[in-house]
Amino acid sequence: MDRAVLLLSVLSLGVSSQPITEGQRLFSIAVERVHNLHLLAQRLFTEFESSLQTEEQRQLNKIFLQDFCNSDYIISPIDKHETQRSSVLKLLSISYRLIESWEFPSRSLSVGPAARNQISPKLSELKTGILLLIGANQDGAEMFPDSSTLQLAPYGNYYQSLGADESLRRTYELLACFKKDMHKVETYLTVAKCRLSPEANCTL
């Protein structure tokens, strides 16, 4: 029994003494931040949807399924298999573009001021963290030769004066797309982080 306890102690010491690299630390922070953003996006969408009438929900969901998100112009993996085959740098680059595409629209989300005030700084912090990870992983490659190409057009006529029905549709679309994109970024960063552990199973 004493020998077994001693062996377990040695093994535990060996595991706990494994150094955590700066890259792993940055990835952990980035994954945690986008996870929190994804949860916030889910909550905001659920709260908005629950405030609608049943028929309104049905019609908006039908319209959204036929529509597309502004960020769909950003080329990204089409399924989990392509995601797993993508390089760490590619996943980071797509994540950066997705986060940046929300910096402006997020300021006009039709949510309470407390929630809206949380979103912008969280996006900015996450964008900075991803940029640091890109710098650490690009090995001299230039991922963003023209920063102007990263700026996407605003979401249609969302910033114009809208009628009641159109405004409702735009709010639904923005919140649904925000939730969708935060889920994408969380998936990409989680897979990229997993690549740092060769023994880990990164299957989605």
UniProtKB/Swiss-Prot annotation:
Q: Which Pfam families match?
A: Hormone_1 (PF00103)
Q: Which residues carry this modification: Pyrrolidone carboxylic acid?
A: Q18
One GO cellular component term of this record is: extracellular space
Q: Which InterPro entries match?
A: 4_helix_cytokine-like_core (IPR009079), Somatotropin (IPR034975), Somatotropin/Prolactin (IPR001400), Somatotropin_CS (IPR018116)
Location(s) in or outside the cell: Secreted
Output the superkingdom of the source species: Eukaryota
The intrachain disulfides are C69-C177, C194-C202
What GO MF annotations does this protein's record show? growth hormone activity; growth hormone receptor binding; metal ion binding
Binding annotation for Zn(2+): H35, E186
> Which keywords fit this entry according to its UniProt record?
Disulfide bond, Hormone, Metal-binding, Pyrrolidone carboxylic acid, Secreted, Signal, Zinc
A single Gene Ontology biological process assigned to it is: growth hormone receptor signaling pathway
Signal sequence region: 1-17
Q: Does the keyword Endoplasmic reticulum apply?
A: no
Q: Which CDD domains match?
A: somatotropin_like
In UniProt terms, what function does this protein have?
Answer: Growth hormone plays an important role in growth control and is involved in the regulation of several anabolic processes. Implicated as an osmoregulatory substance important for seawater adaptation.
Q: Which family does it belong to?
A: Belongs to the somatotropin/prolactin family.
What PANTHER family does the entry give?
SOMATOTROPIN (PTHR11417:SF2), SOMATOTROPIN,PROLACTIN (PTHR11417)
- What is the protein name stated in its UniProt record? Somatotropin
